[in-house]
Amino acid sequence: IMGSTGAGKTSFINNVTGQTLPVGHELDSCTKDIREVRFKRGKRNVVLVDTPGFGDSSMSDAEVLRLIAKHLAGTKLTGIIYMHRISDSKVEGGTRRNYKMFHQLCGSDHLQQVAIVTTWWDKVDFITADSREKTLKTGETLFKPMLDHNATMMRHDGTPTRAKDIVDHFLRLERMVLKIQSQLVLDKMSLPVTDAGSVINTDLLNDARRCVDRLAAVQDELR
């Protein structure tokens, strides 16, 4: 389960399992490491993997990606849930970058096993939320590229029933190999040069160049 800090990943796990894992507030995540939560759903043994949020106040997105990639190197998944707050009135550039990074992490071959789950439907009126969902579905820099390759968009209303329905969606699927797993394990690539790592590195390099240019301009002004 991936997504930005405060999207509701841990709350979702609590809804499914009936546990009471600590939940952070919107600006600070309680999940600082990979956390596996095991439970039974009917006769099936299920493992939900809680991950630190992108946009965390204490970790960079590159650090979060490194933690996730390290865990994925030895794990085959049945599916991936990416959570997004429908209450967000706009999508910032860093968040759009993370959508692109997430797409590259998964690759396009197994996106039928990816669910984009929108949360916080109780925090905004339905008409506004429905309009935002349509924007997320149709935006070329949002989720449209993944949906075009058979990813699914689902709603989570914060209830245990809906959370369990979302988990059940994945229980009929086989395990898969993600693009980043293939690149790290089979192709022996280092994380920064994988397709997912390159998305984050490109933005970091551009930020660094802007900082250097700004520093040079300030130095000229001081002289």
Q: Positions of the model-derived regions?
A:
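Switch I (effector-binding) loop of TRAFAC-class P-loop GTPase G-domains
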Residues: 17-46, 56
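Conserved C-terminal guanine-recognition region of P-loop GTPase G domains, centered on the G4
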Residues: 69-146
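Short acidic, Gly/Ser-rich segments with clustered Asp/Glu that frequently serve as metal-coordination loops
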Residues: 52-59
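C-terminal non-catalytic interaction/localization modules
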Residues: 1-29, 59, 63, 109-112, ...
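Amphipathic alpha-helical interface elements that mediate macromolecular binding in regulatory proteins
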Residues: 10-14, 35, 46-49, 62-70, ...
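Core residues of folded domains in eukaryotic genome-function proteins
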Residues: 33-35, 44-47, 76-79, 110-113, ...
